[in-house]
Amino acid sequence: MRSDLTAFLMMQYKNNQSVLVVIYTKDTNRVLMLQRQDDPDFWQSVTGTIESDETPKKTAIRELWEEVRLDISENSTALFDCNESIEFEIFPHFRYKYAPNITHCKEHWFLCEVEKEFIPVLSEHLDFCWVSAKKAVEMTKSQNNAEAIKKYLFNLRR
């Protein structure tokens, strides 16, 4: 009985494995930034928790659909797996979503190139904007989001 209760309680918490998907445009190289509902001062790229039956890539595809209604197929070349993941400290005001004593999350990085800027259908965010990579880095409170943009988009040349 005790293990059943523990399993049930663990299902109520978020997994501490997630994805970050930085969406940028092919024509302008601008980055899509999203304003969080639970912290309106927090702007970020698409993020999401990896479910128990998912790979990081499947999570990235699902989160693109859920957060901005961008439909990317499994074989699409628009979604690029950076094959990089980082561990970061979860902001204290978001820790209630995780099991007790969980303070860090492992995040897998992806890029998603779209042909041109689009108006996302928002279901989990208050607002959006398309900005330069430099401005996106300045806007986000997430150090890892800023690092991914700097590493992969600052020197992007066409």
UniProtKB/Swiss-Prot annotation:
Keywords: Folate biosynthesis, Hydrolase, Magnesium, Metal-binding. CDD domains: NUDIX_DHNTPase_like (cd04664). Binds 1 Mg(2+) ion per subunit. Residues 14-153 form the Nudix hydrolase domain. The keyword Secreted does not apply. It catalyses: 7,8-dihydroneopterin 3'-triphosphate + H2O = 7,8-dihydroneopterin 3'-phosphate + diphosphate + H(+). Substrate binds at residues 14, 36, 47, 88-91, 142. The keyword Metal-binding applies. It is an enzyme of class 3 (hydrolase). This is Dihydroneopterin triphosphate diphosphatase. The gene is nudB.
